[in-house]
Amino acid sequence: MPEKPLRIVLVGAGALLGKALNEELSVSAFAAADLHLVDDEAALGKLTAAGDEATFIQQIEPDSFDGCDFTFFAGSRELTRTHWHQAFRAGSRIVDLSGELEGEPGVPLRAPWVQDNPAAAPDLQTRAVVSAHPVALLLALLVTHGGQTAMMKALWATLLQPASEYGHEALEELHRQTANLLSFQPLPTDVFRGQSAFTLAVSFGGESPVQPAGSAGVISGQYAEVAPAGSPSLALQVIQAPVFHGYALSVAVELSRPLAANALGRALAGPHVHIVADADAFPGNVRAVEEEDMQVLVRPVFEDAGSAASRETRRFWLWIVADNLKLAAQNAIACAAELDRLRPRGGVQ
């Protein structure tokens, strides 16, 4: 008798991250699942797609999680806080993309592409996991690929963070600010609490929900947790950029021994990482949106005439762009696949 399809509930289906996750699920190993899209009242009734079928986003009801195998929380932290116990009590396995469950007892932080320590892996008792921040995953993935060839000693990174990290409202406000500045109109500041268009900012003040320094703390902490043992230290600053989508990172790398740029590129290349050899062909963050892999440009920093002559150096600049929403969705699906391998199958004989 064929196994019945998995039942999946996507909470926060109307959010930007929820939409990206819905799209990625439709082309993943979970494509045949019975997918239910739910959200709070603000997103009710919106027409969207679940796989190849049109559907409406439904309201979260007391029985929304009954018989559910997996629940993805892709909306706000508040939405997760309100409903995750309901999903847990219903017996669903949970993947949290909002970060609300980080630190909860028995809820590990996961980045399956880079975490290979069996002691840290989910077990049969694991019912919920937090999907790691995409930038923590991205940096840990580069370190993992580099391995013994690159032997990285330290990373210094600057992240240019897009408005889409903060949802529809932030995108709309950035758009309106851009238009209003060009027409000399007052700026809406409900989300950012200050000007975000045509400027780079490290802070919008304590009243703003947009806190680049807070993002830096989350990413640094999660990188330390998911990166392999012995990984290089990370110094990170986050700058809010006047862009809609896509991460861009400038990363300075120091190695333990000199390498040529092409040798480092070969070491870093691998699953989910595409090395772009020519700067003229390197995509910006706009073109990186919808790319399956992060795009990486490797540039040597020659310390002296000797290293320039040998074309080998211990210091490099990496310029990296990636689709922030797609990367987050892909990691969440990898988390679910990890939990699915532990799911009991069949009946008692």
Question: Where are the language model's segments positioned?
Answer:
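N-terminal Rossmann-like NAD(P) cofactor-binding subdomain of oxidoreductases
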Residues: M1-G194, S231-S233, G284-E290, V296-L297, ...
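Charged docking surfaces used in two-component/phosphorelay signaling
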Residues: T71, A163-Q349
